[in-house]
Amino acid sequence: MQFLKGDIQEGILKAAEEVFLEKGYKDASMREIASRAGVTVSNIYHYFTNKDEIFRTILKPVLNDLYAMIYNHDADQMTIDVFMDSDYQKMSVREYISEHRDRLRLLLFQAQGSVLENFRSEYTDLMTRTISVFFQGMKQKYPHINIAITNFFIHLNTVWLFALLEELVLHPVKKEEMEKFIAEYIAFETAGWKELMNA
């Protein structure tokens, strides 16, 4: 039976994700990935330049959605309600966790040794800079709001987001419990931003 190139590539990615989840990036070997995928190591290199590229390809959907959170902060397109709309925020967090739980585990806990091992701190710094610029744009649209919020607080707010994701990944909870916890977190967040911004 002849396998299509796309099928082989998908098989490699599926096998690699299993190995990464079991061993983490650092201890996963190309030999084991090849064995699990039923191909030779040299065959893997027809599709991926190295182990890092495989890892990044697996995590691409997770990374795309996280970066979308940053690049969707366009003051020209958004209203102040983005900070106050708890239903929208609850849905976003819930869907993100449900869709990416295993891959979030890879990114947050098993990326040591990969090009993504410092992703959390790099993302936090980028989010802090982006939100600061976003606040300037929002101030022009809503002159009454307070944007005198320290960069360190914005930084901490992103750190808390990762803490939320970590806890939900580490502790498998029933759907109802997760819904309640996310609702509590978002209620706390939206009330806090409303108070800080005098919105």
Spell out what each predicted region is:
Residues M1-K5, M197:
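N-terminal intrinsically disordered/low-complexity leader segments
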Residues K5, M30, K60-Y67:
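Short, basic, alpha-helical segments at the C-terminal edge of helix-turn-helix-like DNA-binding modules
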Residues G11, A15, V19-E53, T57:
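Helix-turn-helix
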Residues R56-V62, F119:
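Alpha-helical DNA-contacting segments of helix-turn-helix folds
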Residues T57, Y71-E99:
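Hydrophobic alpha-helical connector segments
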Residues Y71-M78, L107-S114, P143-I145:
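Short linear capping/connector segments at secondary-structure termini
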Residues E95-Y96, S114-Q140, N151-T158:
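Amphipathic alpha-helical packing segments from all-alpha helical-bundle domains
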Residues R105-F109, M138-F188, L196-A199:
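Hydrophobic/aromatic-rich alpha-helical bundle segments in the mid-to-C-terminal region
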